Each structure stands twice: as structure tokens, then as C-alpha cells.
Amino acid sequence: MVHKALSYIIHTFILMICLLIAGSCTVVRHDQQTESEEDELSIYFDNGEFDAKLYVESVWEEAVLPRIKEEAVEAEVLFESLNSDPSTAIEKYGYRIEVTAPYNFMVKGSAIITQANVKSAAATISIDANGPDGKPVEIQIGPVIKGTAVRDSMDFIHFEDFTNQLEFANISREMNNHIKATILASLKREELVGAKIRYLGAFQWVEGEGVLITPVDLVVEE
Amino acid sequence: MKKTLFLLVLFSFVFAAAGVWAGGQQDAESEDEQSNLIYIITPSHDNPFFKTEAVAAEDEAEKLGYQTRVLSHDDDANLQDQQFGNAIAAGAAAIICDNAGADASIGPIRRAKEAGIPTFLIDREINETGLAVSQIVSNNYQGAVIGGEKFVELMGESGKYVELVGKESDTNAGIRSKGYHEVIDQYPDLEMVARQSANWSQTEAYSKMESIIQANPDIKGVICGNDTMAMGAMAALKTADMGDVIVVGFDGSNDVRDSILAGDIKATVLQTCAYNARLAVQQADKYIKTGSTGAPEKQLTDCVLIDKANADKLDNFVLSE
């Protein structure tokens, strides 16, 4: 008992000495921010060391396209499956990167373009396919491409391999830029309605909503 | 006076910690018992977002049989340093932390690791891996992108707008702004006429918005880095009889939910903060008991868009099915 009390006193004494030493030091804030001018807020988080464009170029032909070609399901089969038994369809064909995210699906098919929705910068074409729940099926044709369906369908791209969420986000942006530059640039946007196409791509599916495919290949047949 | 008070508080913490420490030492001598104390360190509870995540973590920890010590670092990296010091001195079993800076937090997390105390980060990430056991990161960038897309849609892809940015020292202020611009800047007919930081604050957003309105009476939209600033901006706009200006926020607070339901603010982005906090505690528990969480260090959780269609299902940062 005496031993314990003594030990307590010694501990307290040591702590007090530590505090006296600490108290005599000047505490310097190391999180001070310099006031920046309006419109010039700096984003220090993005240090620019990671070149997402280079990364995407290095994996596109070798890994992205092969995976989608390999895994893509025929549109009629996939949509019918999502329509009749979503949980089985998800288990069989779906892929997601984390538990709170929607599932992604890779898809391929042939279709007729029924409508070109080109008023918005995030332009799409509607195709004559029956989406789950009878919802419409659209393919993004840019210039603005929404979402991260292509990146999030890749089983070799993991968030933890990158420094932070900006690097991870930049991969998706560069993938979409790559799609714009290679697949969509040559699309004759005035002659779309009625044309027959073949497509390959990915979409993120939320039950009850329409299907919005990001294409990785889109060919208008003559 | 403030300094004296601060020192007093510090003293009391250290003594409390010393008590636990000494107690722990004695226990260790007698039966080698493991610490049962989890430190929960977050930004100020003045913001209901951080309060929710702290309360969720505390609740989950107590459910799993832990004692908790809940602290706020007020986004002050020095205060966070001291709190980590306390946790180390107390021989805590684990630290759950929404950190005070992607770079400034690396030091204290490393010291905790060296002292054998695992840290589980929630919400914000740090610029280093291999120090924290888990980083359950709220995907603010993805959230900003869906918020930005909704804003663009509401604006009809054209018009003048204002951006209110959060506190610059906060990583997420930068991430959200970058996400917004990633989307908005692709639309040439959307013109940003002012961009200012209102430091996450409702009152600051109100006063900044007041002066922005003076110079730009023809604005059509305001996109905000968080919900408290959205509330401030909306109030200033309504005072100026400009209540039909499109305001979009970020966080998913009950205040903004009510504003959306009343037809004022148009949309916000929900971060699943309560879910993330509970997940972090569950992983801490698993790690303490088995030495592994079974999950990768960096885990990303998606945000969800809240608008008139689903606002009524939102309560305390949880969206019911």
C-alpha cells in the first residue's frame, strides 16, 4: 500500500516537472494560414505529383479495355436480369468499390438511336433498349461526361493505392477525357437519330433510375 | 486570463490522465489488464455534423463496453497535439479522430503509433499511409461532384453565380471547391462573379453575402462549401428579397433539410458521418481484440444528394430507407 502511494507521488512529481519545462517554452502555432486574395484560394492538398493522365494512358489499352471487353454482358440479358431479379443480377454481374457506393455494370450491345439530347453540355443519346423497370437507356456523348462508372468498374484500381481522394478522382476525370478525345471526338453529332450503333461501356445503377452508360467504344454502323 | 484558464484546463486533463495512467500501471502490475478507454477527438461540436459523428462514436464504443473520453480540437493542430499526448499518457486503447489537418496530424498519429496506441481516422484523411490503422474517408470529392451537377441542372447550365468556400486550413474546403469547379467549369455559360471564404460560419456567410449582393444584384445561384454557410447565404438573400436565388449546400444538416422542405435551399450533399463513426469504432474493437481490422487502411464512403425528393427521409445525418 505504502509502495503504491509512493509510486503515485513520484509519478505526479515527474509530471509537474515536465509541465514546468513545457510551460517555459513558447508554443508556436504551425497551422497559421496566410490570408489570400479573393479568387485565389489555394488548394494545398493537391500537390500535383501524381500524373493521372499518364496513369490512364498506361492502363487503358492494357487493362481497362480488356476488362470491359471480357466482363461486359449483353444489354438484353443484363437489363432483363436487373428487372426480374436485381439481387441475383448484382451478385452475378455487379461490381462496387465500397459498401456505400452503388453497383457498376459493364455492358455491350447493338441499338438504334431514338433521340439525341444535345441541348445540355452533358449530352446523351437515347437508344431503343428496355432498361430495368422500363426506364430509358442513354449513352453519354459529352462534352461533359458525368460519373465515375468506368473507373469504379476496374478491380485493379483501389483507393488505398493513391495518396488521397483527389488523385483518385483525377483518374476518373482523365478516363472521361480520354473517352472524349478518342471515342467521341469523331462522332457526327448531326446525324445521330435513326443510326444503328454498337457500344461497349459501363454504368452505375441505382434501382428505380434510368441507365446512363459511359461508353468506352461507340461505333456507328454504315 | 485566457492563458491561465487554458493552463488550468490542461493541468486538470494531465492529472486526470496521470490518474488513469497510474491506475493502468497498477493494473498492469496486478493482472496485465488491457486499457478500456477510447479517445474520440473531433472538430467543434458547434457544427452539428461533428457533434453527430462524436455522439455516434461514443454510443458505439459504449455499446461495445468501452469507456470514452470525447474531446474537440477546434481545428487547432496544437490542441490536437496535446489531446493525443493525453491519450498516450492515459494509455488509451484506441483513438478515433476527425483530424485537424492532412499534414499537421501526421506527427501526433505517429507518436500514438509508437506508443502502441492505434488511431482510426474518420471523415478527413491524412497525406500519409501506414500510421493510422484505418482512414474511413468521406468521399467529399464525389459529393462535391454530385452537388455541382445538381447546381448546374438547377441553374439551367447558365447564369452568374457565387461560391462560398470553407475554412482554408481544412482539407475538405479545398476538396469540395475543386469538385464543384471540376463540374461547373465545363459549362461556358456559367459565370462565377465572386468567390470568398466564409470559414464554415453562418454569420460570416450572411455578412459576406450581403456585400456580394450589393455588387452583384443579378446573381442566379450560390454554391456553398457547407450547410451552415448555405443557411447564412439563404438568410441574406431572403432579407434582400432575393429568395428565389438557387442555393446549394453540403453536409445534410437538419437545418438545411427543413429549408429544402420549405422550398428555400434547393439541395445539399449528405455525408454518412454517423455510419463512418460507428464503422471506425467497430474496426477499433476488432483491432484491439484480434490485431487486425480485416479491412484496408483507406476506405472511401460515398456521399448522397439530398433534394426535395428525399429530404423528408433525412434526420441527424442518417437517411432512412
Where are these regions (language model features)?
Chain A
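Sec-dependent bacterial lipoprotein signal peptides
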Residues: 1-25
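OB-fold and OB-like single-stranded nucleic-acid-recognition modules
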Residues: 25-222
